[in-house]
Amino acid sequence: MTHDIWRLTTAFLTMLLTAGLALGTGCASDSYAAKGAAQGGTSGAVAGALGGMMSALVFGGDIAEAGARGAVWGGTTGAVAGGISGAQTDKAVAAQEQAARDAELERFKAEIGTDAFNGVVALAECKHDIAIANAREAAKSNKPDYALAGVWVEALTEADRQREQEARALLPDIVERDRDIKTKAEAEARMYEALDGLRDIRVEYNLPVNCSS
């Protein structure tokens, strides 16, 4: 059910956003442009989806909707940049695609911090040890939002590799840091909601759904 909502929301927002951007940018029709758009769209969408999911965890909001919106903005930005670049020289292509990727990454890093962002990307790729290392660095931050994001990434990572006891042990820390979550039960429900969102992202972008540790 969650994945159905994800797909419907993403499809609808993509249709609206792509139509609006196309009016302002025009389109490139050669094969390189199409390839650039596809690659830029996919990588941007994954980053956007993960960033949206984490932003919802830290700042509040619907996780599935935030992830879908992040995927649409990230994917469309990458696809349009890739399509435009495809009509130009290789050097210009590389510069524009890199600029689009960097801008998207920096936006989410500014919201949740570089360590937490790197951690959730590693988690999506089933790199649990790397995710934990980044999460713990994030949790040391003197910026409360960054630190909270780090604890969330660690909890999600432990839950994803089916270490339920370790994941639940982090819930009191989340309750203490999060302004909106008042009980361990609320934190646990939110954790599993985010875990479902993470797995939806993996399904959508052909990443392994269940990781073997």
Regions found by a protein language model. Name each.
Residues 11-22:
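Bacterial N-terminal signal peptides
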